[in-house]
């Protein structure tokens, strides 16, 4: 509000100094007062609809985690949970001998503890365990940049091994970055409100909120910046409800129980890839549109990694890469690299830069960027692409 008043004062003083016509100056000053009044009223109106009590980002989640006996602090309990999860995910032998894995976990744990995000991670992990194991609600394997966290994988927050797919932690949490930390949880569409009710019963109505985004309010950005905090979104996906219903029908028809491991089938099944190659993907999340099915027939994907690449390229910013990627896969175009050091990171995608992780690793390898700096570079490049596409 003070900024608006100061801005209007400066505008009025400028009008007085530069105007040669008194009547014209009075008209301009009146309009300036009207503009300032409208802006102030909009902000007051917006704040009256959002009586937020802004607190420390992690303080609320700290209050929700109970530290078991035998642990002196939340950080100690968090580290113990991560280590136990690492042994389950990777095995005791690998955890003991793999220096790269040890260093990655240690690095992530330090960043998380420094930012006091331990309770945030534990809260999400406990919520997913409760909904999946005890409430029998299916959830997705992990969405967006949280999939780059080995700690999240060890805690059961995601089912994607970041080390296997070359995913980077700094895409999710960057101490020198500007984006807020947020985790999206995909759950069955029909069960979303059941999870909301569970949260209300266990943590109280005052701890939850249904959020909407009103794009027409230009002044909303100021409130959003002030109110940045740790949040998570529960997103209902119909495909998960359909998958669960299919498994129930199979059990009923064939009389055999389908375990939850069926939600993570082998990724090299020839019959499955034949369906993709023939574009029989109606109802398959991300692969059901007419244009995507056309690309599937042209690309003829034969590996899980190629499906990931096609899904990634099917975006306004980089959709033009599909043509070159497809030609290189089928030997219709030579695979080239602008620098010999690039082959290490681009070989899997036939020399085409598709992922932000590739940009980050290349900048670290060639320009000696830190992981945090490389994340900012990748974001800047992607933002530029988005601006140009618009």
Please tell me what each predicted stretch does:
Residues 6, 118-122, 189-190:
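Conserved phosphate-coordination/catalytic loops
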Residues 15, 119-122, 218, 354:
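Aromatic- and histidine-enriched alpha-helix N-cap/loop-to-helix transition segments
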Residues 22, 37-41, 121, 139-143, ...:
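Alpha-helix N-cap/helix-initiation sites
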Residues 2-56:
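Terminal-proximal interaction/regulatory segments of ATP-powered molecular machines
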Residues 55-87, 109, 127-131, 137-142, ...:
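Mg2+-dependent phosphoryl-transfer active-site scaffold
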Residues 11-14, 123-127, 194-195:
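Well-ordered alpha-helical segments embedded in enzymatic catalytic cores
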